[in-house]
From Swiss-Prot:
Disulfide bonds: none annotated. Pfam families: PRC_RimM, RimM. Its main location: cytoplasm. One of its GO terms (molecular function) is ribosome binding. GO terms for cellular component: cytoplasm; ribosome. An accessory protein needed during the final step in the assembly of 30S ribosomal subunit, possibly for assembly of the head region. Essential for efficient processing of 16S rRNA. May be needed both before and after RbfA during the maturation of 16S rRNA. It has affinity for free ribosomal 30S subunits but not for 70S ribosomes. InterPro entries: PRC_barrel-like_sf (IPR011033), PRC_RimM (IPR056792), RimM (IPR011961), RimM_N (IPR002676), RimM_N_sf (IPR036976), Transl_B-barrel_sf (IPR009000). Residues 101-174 form the PRC barrel domain. This is Ribosome maturation factor RimM. The PRC barrel domain binds ribosomal protein uS19. The gene is rimM. Keywords: Chaperone, Cytoplasm, Ribosome biogenesis, rRNA processing.
């Protein structure tokens, strides 16, 4: 069975003195991805002193809407400080999809052609930015510009994985540039 890696979180600041860490969750399935015993690939940021390459979840709990995770390899606050900024990846079957039909893994969206609602080509999806309010699709236009499109139903009404396309309810300034002001 072919597998791929998906980004599931980024380690934040330490919580307490026993090595618990806050987690910037990048998955819609945190209870599954951070279940005790789960093994994740650790990707330290450039310049990090951390030598962690794999971590095993010891425990996970919610505290005031923040996920706190303890890893077998992180025993104390000093080790937790060194782990800050590490990206965590889970291995999933290549054909896996999230349980919710309106949710997608990043790799399912990257490479899709982007069209407006009339069928005109806008470019292609080159990435996603995971933000606080909502995720953003990065759409590379034919002229080489990158546009950030909020990944919400009102602006992205259709995702057709089989057809390898997304439909964007474009408006001036979203993907297409604003019209030139003729008064200058």
């Amino acid at each position: 069975m072919e597998t791929i890696e998906v980004l599931v979180g980024r380690i934040g600041k330490p919580h307490g003195i026993r090595g618990e860490l806050t987690l910037d969750v990048r998955t819609d399935e945190p209870e599954r991805r951070f279940a005790p015993g789960a093994v994740l690939r650790a990707e330290p940021p450039a310049g990090s002193a951390s030598r962690l390459r794999r971590v095993t979840v010891r425990s996970a709990r919610w505290h005031q809407s923040t996920l706190l995770v303890a890893f077998e390899e992180v025993a104390d606050r000093t080790a937790a400080e060194a782990a800050r900024g590490i990206l965590l990846h889970a291995t999933v079957p290549a054909d896996a999809a999230p349980d919710d039909p309106d949710e997608y893994y990043d790799h399912q969206l990257v490479g899709l052609a982007a069209y407006d609602v009339s069928g005109a080509a806008l470019g292609s999806v080159t990435g996603l930015v995971h933000g606080g309010a909502q995720d953003l699709l990065t759409v590379r236009t034919p002229d080489g510009r990158d546009a950030l499109v909020p990944f919400v139903k009102a602006l992205v009404p259709e995702v057709d994985l089989a057809g390898r396309r997304v439909v964007i309810a474009d408006r001036p300034g979203l993907v297409t540039p604003l019209p030139e002001d003729d008064e200058h």
